């Protein structure tokens, strides 16, 4: 997709999905995550909606997250995963001897995977352009008992650095992308017109 003076939309392959609408909204360069969400409120239909930051990939079952969200009646659900350490973890004795080494272990606790299900009431928690969704709105929802966590134990990987970008592209190119849950559909033949 290219926007601007010479806008262009290209569809890759043949897809059977129906009823999808994509809206691109310019929320400004200086607007923070909560402010961006507030600015797109007018484009969101219905009482329940999904949102993600778009910088992580996962094999999370979105239907299960949505069902979990509907089961508890709270304002928001965040998908959580175990933290993954970027470096090996060492246990070191007092004199410097390494007693245990674990390469890039999964940590204890939970971190946000950045996949959310929200009710429209979420907009009551958002401020202006400076509002950071991950701070005051989510902190307030948690204090009020309106934020639930859906634990995902499958694949999750964030793409925040060039190194992560390279790793994820390598997985894709080797056809080892665990987040690719869809089947490729052969493209339909193109009809050539002389018009």
Describe each region flagged by the PLM.
Residues 1-53, 64, 161, 190:
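Conserved N-terminal catalytic core of the sugar/cofactor nucleotidyltransferase
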Residues 48-50, 57, 62-70, 81-85, ...:
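Catalytic-core segments of class I nucleotidyltransferases/pyrophosphorylases
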Residues 92-93:
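Extended acidic/charged loop-beta regions that coordinate divalent cations
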């Amino acid at each position: 997709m290219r926007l601007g003076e010479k806008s262009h939309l290209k569809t890759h392959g043949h897809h059977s999905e129906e009823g999808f609408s994509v809206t691109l909204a310019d929320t400004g360069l200086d607007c923070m995550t909560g402010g961006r969400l507030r600015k797109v409120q007018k484009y969101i239909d219905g009482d329940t909606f999904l949102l993600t930051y778009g910088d992580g990939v996962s094999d999370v079952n979105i239907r299960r997250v949505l069902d979990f969200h509907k089961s508890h009646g709270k304002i928001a659900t965040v998908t959580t995963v175990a933290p993954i350490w970027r470096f090996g973890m060492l246990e070191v004795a007092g004199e410097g001897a390494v007693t245990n080494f674990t390469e890039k272990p999964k940590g204890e606790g939970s971190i946000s995977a950045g996949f959310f299900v929200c009710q429209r009431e979420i907009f009551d928690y958002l401020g202006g352009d400076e509002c950071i969704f991950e701070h005051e709105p989510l902190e307030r929802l948690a204090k009020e008992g309106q934020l639930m966590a859906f634990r995902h134990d499958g694949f999750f990987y964030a793409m925040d650095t060039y190194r992560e970008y390279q790793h994820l592209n390598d997985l894709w190119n080797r056809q080892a992308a665990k987040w690719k849950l869809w089947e490729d559909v052969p493209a339909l033949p193109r009809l050539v017109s002389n018009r």
